[in-house]
Each structure stands twice: as C-alpha cells, then as structure tokens.
Amino acid sequence: MTEKMVETAPPGFELLPQGLGYTDTLQPVYRKVEGDSAIFGLVVGTQHSNTMGICHGGVLMTLADITATTGANLAHGVASGSPTVHLSIDFIASARQGEWLQAEAEHVSVKRRFGFSSGGIYNSAGAVARFSATVYFPDHQGMWKDGRRGDGLLKRQEEG
C-alpha cells in the first residue's frame, strides 16, 4: 500500500492566528503578506472536504472571500472592518486532499467607498477557481460598540 503525499505550505507563509471568527473553521490556514499583497493558502484536509473527497466549495468561497477582502483592505490602507457586499466564484477544477491551495488577489482597485478585487485559487496543476469581489469601506464604526476596528487577517502572528 502506498502513502498519499501531502503537500506543505511553501517558504514564507505563516500560520494564521486563531481568534478570527469563522476563519478559524478553516485552520490550519496560512498567509504571506508582502507589501500591498496578501496570499492565503491551506493544505486540503478531511475537514475541508466534501463526501467525494475533494475540497468543498464553501471552503473555496471562504478562501476567496478572505483573500479578496484583504487585498482590498491593503489597497485602501485599512487592516479590517470592510464587509464583502458581492462575491462570485467560478469553480474550474477540483482540489484533492493533501494538495496545497493558494489564493491570490491579482487585480485590486479602490473607488471611493468600494474596493474591487479579482483573483484565483490554484493548486500544483493550475487554476481551481476564479473569483471577483466588491468590498465596502464604511465611514462609521458599524457594529463595533467599543469603537475598535481591529486588525483582522493582517495582524501579524508574532504580535498576537
């Protein structure tokens, strides 16, 4: 019997800290922030898979959402607090357990109170999904009663 090879996070990626709400359900999730770009990734595990043994579409949607929003936040100069108001995704190929998935926001623009982000999710064979998102940059504190906005997904692990 042969063992299935499990890919690992490439060099330069750090584990996303716990305590970020729903994103914690994807753990372990990794990120690499360089300048004004952020890349997120994960190794597809059983917790990410559907009954066919491939990565669940909801996992891909969540990975697209955090990548698109973080890309827009970086372009706008804020760390978090910007809700996604639109997200569309095209599923192109499957990703199997043990494969490294990497999500990248490739085109980001900011217009007034909105950020627009599009990109892709890839495995070693190529594109798994393409996404497009619109993010709203509120001019108020929203639901946060104590006045904080937080630093969300951009918070460095060594600071937390």
Please name every model-derived segment.
Residues M1-G160:
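Terminal targeting signals and extreme-terminal segments of soluble enzymes
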